[in-house]
């Protein structure tokens, strides 16, 4: 048998890591549901025809193909398989909307009536792994989770408003204090490029360079753009707008004046102005979002508002999203022509940021209380009753697995386990405690121990944990 290990670019998540991951995922799910999003799950394996042509030539090379055992010996070199592992969650969403978007079912409230199986707008969240045959490296994996929330079927800027509000609430719930949702608009950027006299064919490559301004100084980005054929006047026109500073309203007012000759830019500015008004009306704290005209989001399928969340931690973007009104049509093969807008949370980067910022310090492992168990007559039954009562009170309680009569060594072994697992309290009921009608309650953080009445031990411990 060879050395034990995992495939490159994949990971095991041991209990201490899983507790953190589940904490983040559960927090996101709670926020998603609070905003009316419903869960969706799709198969890991998709038909190749569903994925083909959706990710460009380079992206397609990274798709994992699935070979059935019956065709192992019949596939020729370069021949495609019929199935592949999903590459992202957006294409499966488009397939689902194309398959079920117009499907009618009986209305649960009135079986005589028909209603759409997928409400319109369709608000879904999806948290599942995806696979890419990338070269493994720092922060780059072949298997990783995406956490997406999308709204399909509405052009209203209220969609962007709620997604940004949701994003702010989610990061605050996770304990982040210093983070910013940067906001821009693809039509504003299109108008900027247009008014600067840059050919439309260069739009994608120019935006790719502009998007590096959060990592590189402006001079380096200017040099890169000059290398792509932009002259001094074009560069000045770009950076005059990109460099605008002040409040979000002041930045938009400056852009409105500088880009007065562009219909596309004015349309984008108008939508962003409305978005700011809605965010304020919804009570979203403006300390957590701002207009940033250097935000470009390299993906060319965005058509309207775009946004990206950055934190004080040095991990890069921890979330991003935007409006993509043509993508569902393209990805569904023309079966569904619906506007859409969504956001995605970077689970691995969020975990890295929270670890860096010490936001997991108060997060304990699965157990809260360990009831030490001893096999003395009568003691064992009391331990059973105590652990059952704690669980009924909603406390995460474990029973020690020591079956011998009370000994100091047996107590040390069980307390060692409690410390390893990070319990808050240990409850000790030995023959002496039994005789006194008491239990010894040990605080495993402070190491202090006290005697409490055995009859009310469960309620007392539950109360302390919930206070």
Curated annotation (Swiss-Prot):
**EC category name:** ligase
Enzymatic reactions: tRNA(His) + L-histidine + ATP = L-histidyl-tRNA(His) + AMP + diphosphate + H(+)
Per UniProt, which keywords does this protein have? Answer: Aminoacyl-tRNA synthetase, ATP-binding, Cytoplasm, Ligase, Nucleotide-binding, Protein biosynthesis
The UniProt record lists the EC number as 6.1.1.21
TM segment ranges: none
Q: Which domain of life is it from?
A: Bacteria
**Cellular component terms per the entry's GO annotation:** cytoplasm
SUPFAM superfamilies according to UniProt:
Class II aaRS ABD-related, Class II aaRS and biotin synthetases
Location in or out of the cell: Cytoplasm
Kindly give the PROSITE patterns that the UniProt entry links to this protein: AA_TRNA_LIGASE_II (PS50862)
- One biological process GO term for this chain? histidyl-tRNA aminoacylation
State one molecular function term (GO).
ATP binding
Any Pfam family from its record, for instance, is HGTP_anticodon
InterPro entries membership: aa-tRNA-synth_II, aa-tRNA-synth_II/BPL/LPL, Anticodon-bd, Anticodon-bd_dom_sf, His-tRNA-ligase, HisRS-like_core, HisRS/HisZ
What does the annotation say about its assembly with partners? Homodimer.
The text of the family note is: Belongs to the class-II aminoacyl-tRNA synthetase family.
Q: What name has this protein been given in UniProt? A: Histidine--tRNA ligase
Which organism's genome codes for this protein?
Gloeobacter violaceus (strain ATCC 29082 / PCC 7421)
